[in-house]
Regions:
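Terminal, non-catalytic protein-protein interaction segments that mediate quaternary/complex assembly
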Residues: 4, 76, 119-125
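P-loop NTPase catalytic core of nucleic-acid-dependent motor ATPases
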Residues: 1-105
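Helical "lid/switch" subdomain of P-loop NTPase nucleotide-binding domains
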Residues: 104, 115-119, 168
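AAA+/SF3 P-loop NTPase mechanochemical coupling elements
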Residues: 96-101, 136-154
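Conserved catalytic/switch belt of AAA+ P-loop NTPases
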Residues: 120-143
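Walker B catalytic acidic pair
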Residues: 109-111, 122
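Conserved nucleotide-binding/hydrolysis micro-motifs of P-loop NTPases
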Residues: 112-113, 156-160
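A short helix-turn-beta junction within AAA+ P-loop NTPase domains corresponding to the substrate/partner-engaging
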Residues: 161-168
Length: 168
């Protein structure tokens, strides 16, 4: 896998960066909670590349003003522009599964895809799926494809997902 190959050729210089990445680039608090959230998000990203189809149920959502660098931050984490996409507009788009292929971090910019979903259940079902079953154009049969991407969200407002009574 090209992302695995890229990651495995990197050498760590001993500098701790994960603990302070959101503080440095997004102005977040330097709390243990923020550190754990970022660490968990990055561990899910790595897991999806090394173990396609593994559980990755959470989505890191950044809230901030227009131009705060939310999308730039996620693009930076993807390491390569080809491994990032912010073009996820609707969860019910027939070509969505083709679009997921080849991308590592899929940003729901301004949470448009989530807002356009019919319900929280539809959002949860889409985000927590471990594989997608679809037929490529001109193929005869559908195939199961294990997910290798994770999802990230960005919005300018804190009111981006409808209230969920289940708490999940």
């Amino acid at each position: 896998h090209p992302i695995c190959e890229y990651l495995e050729q990197l050498e760590w210089d001993g500098q701790e960066r994960i603990r302070y990445v959101l503080q440095r680039y997004m102005g977040a608090d330097a709390s243990d909670f923020v550190y754990e959230v970022v660490k968990h998000f990055l561990m899910e990203a790595l897991s999806r590349i090394y173990r396609p189809g593994c559980k990755a149920d959470e989505m890191l959502c950044l809230v901030g003003q227009q131009g705060a660098g939310k999308s730039t931050f996620f693009r930076f984490l993807a390491l390569n522009d080809d491994w990032f996409s912010d073009d996820l507009k609707q969860l019910n788009d027939s070509k969505i599964y083709e679009h997921l292929r080849g991308h590592w971090i899929m940003e729901m910019s301004e949470m448009i895809a989530a807002i356009s979903a019919k319900s929280n259940e539809e959002i949860k079902s889409f985000l927590t799926r471990q594989k997608d079953t679809y037929r490529n154009p001109y193929d005869k049969y559908e195939e199961d494809r294990k997910r290798q991407c994770i999802f990230a969200g960005s919005t300018n407002t804190r009111q981006f997902i409808p209230f969920d009574r289940t708490g999940a």
